[in-house]
């Protein structure tokens, strides 16, 4: 009986901490909620105390990363990083400016935008030069598939739906 009382108290405290984190996320990121409402609402529901939402990147930081990678980001990707330098969610969504790198798969050059564990841990979201499209690399199958037309579709449809199912 004592155990159940303690477990109940622990669960209530965890819920309280999660609600606080969600409130804080919404208060600290009004532009994110305005620009990507479905994604932001879904993200707020699954936020865990260990998850991280970074503050906005500067144009200079974005430009430096583009230079380092020798890759021009699509306009929607630049806009996203001007709202947050990155999001790391334990349920399998990682999009960080500093974590981007280039990768060649089957002779094709890509820029890795982040991770999306749709099929397996470590599957990657990719960009190609001169395209708004977001590609998905399922590393266990060693296949690259076109996932979305652009970043807004990725955030507002694919990732929002994925997070809502968690």
Outline where the language-model segments fall.
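Compact, glycine/acidic-enriched structural inserts
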Residues: 137-164
């Amino acid at each position: 009986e004592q155990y159940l009382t303690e477990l109940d108290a622990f669960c209530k405290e965890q819920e309280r901490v999660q609600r606080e984190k969600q409130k804080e996320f919404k208060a600290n990121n009004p532009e994110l909620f305005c620009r990507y409402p479905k994604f932001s609402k879904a993200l707020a529901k699954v936020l865990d105390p260990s998850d991280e939402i970074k503050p906005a990147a500067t144009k200079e930081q974005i430009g430096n990363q583009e230079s380092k990678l020798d890759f021009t980001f699509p306009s929607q990707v630049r806009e996203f990083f001007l709202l947050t330098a990155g999001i790391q969610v334990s349920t399998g969504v990682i999009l960080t400016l500093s974590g981007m790198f280039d990768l060649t798969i089957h002779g094709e050059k890509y820029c890795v935008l982040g991770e999306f564990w749709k099929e397996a841990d470590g599957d990657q979201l990719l960009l190609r030069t001169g395209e708004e499209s977001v590609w998905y690399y399922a590393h266990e199958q060693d296949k690259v598939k076109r996932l979305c037309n652009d970043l807004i579709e990725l955030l507002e449809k694919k990732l929002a739906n994925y997070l809502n199912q968690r």
